[in-house]
Amino acid sequence: SGKVEIELVQYKPEAVDIFEQFQDEFNATHDDIYLKIDSPNDAMTILKTRFIREDNPDIIGIGGDINYSNFLDADMLMDISDFEGLNDIKEKYLEMNKDLEYVPKDGVYAVPYMANAAGILFNRDMFEEHGWEIPTTWTEFTNLCDQIQSEGIQPLYFGFKDTWTTLAPWNAIAVSLCDSDLTYQVNSGKTTFAENYREVAEKEKALLTYGQK
């Protein structure tokens, strides 16, 4: 066909529909390029296997986690410093990319294209019905949970069906209590995770008393 085929493998199967939409829109507007987006269920295992076999996709869509750090450390990713689209990305997100490097490297190796928010969803109707005030501090939050529990209502519901969702409350607490460069401090021998995560773990444990059994 004479078209250049670009393969993108991304690791969020729950986002298949939107990525398929991106694929269709791109292909409809580019006559000389065919974009193929794969969203396999076990994407990370598949990616690691393909890297070992040197069957690398052109683009990968993964999170800013340890897998990204490992791929970067193994020199699996290409420097894209000359990509003009980087000018449209907030500097803070690019700095977060650099924070994921085990050893500081020159260049840019990822394009941040989305950000997640950690928070708590609440039933507004129930709050209005019971006269509960929206808490703004940890103490106000736990006091409210105690009050709700005393009224015979389960205060919290945790989405722990998948293991990764257990990180949501942990991350939200840790980012407020720990230094942003904690990993670097630990790697340089200045401190330990055990020392810094104790309060985080205690607060996470406290939350569990308000959730489902």
Locations of the language-model features?
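Immediate post-signal peptide segment of exported/extracytoplasmic ligand-binding proteins
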Residues: S1-E7, A28-T29, K105-G107, E128, ...
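Short, well-ordered beta-strand elements
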Residues: G2-P13, I33-D38, I59, Y109, ...
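Solvent-exposed loop/turn segments at secondary-structure junctions
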Residues: P13-V16, D42-M44, D65-S69, N116-G119, ...
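Extracytoplasmic "Venus flytrap"/periplasmic binding protein-like
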Residues: E25-Y93, D125, E129-H130, T136
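Loop/turn elements at helix/coil->beta-strand transitions in domains of secreted/extracellular proteins
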Residues: D31-I33, E54-D58, G107-V108, Q149-P155, ...
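Hinge/lid segment of periplasmic solute-binding proteins
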Residues: G63-A118, T142, A168-N171, N196
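Extracytoplasmic/periplasmic solute-binding protein
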Residues: P104-Y113, A118, T142-K190
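Glycine-centered hinge/linker elements that transmit conformational signals in sensory
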Residues: Q147, N187-K213
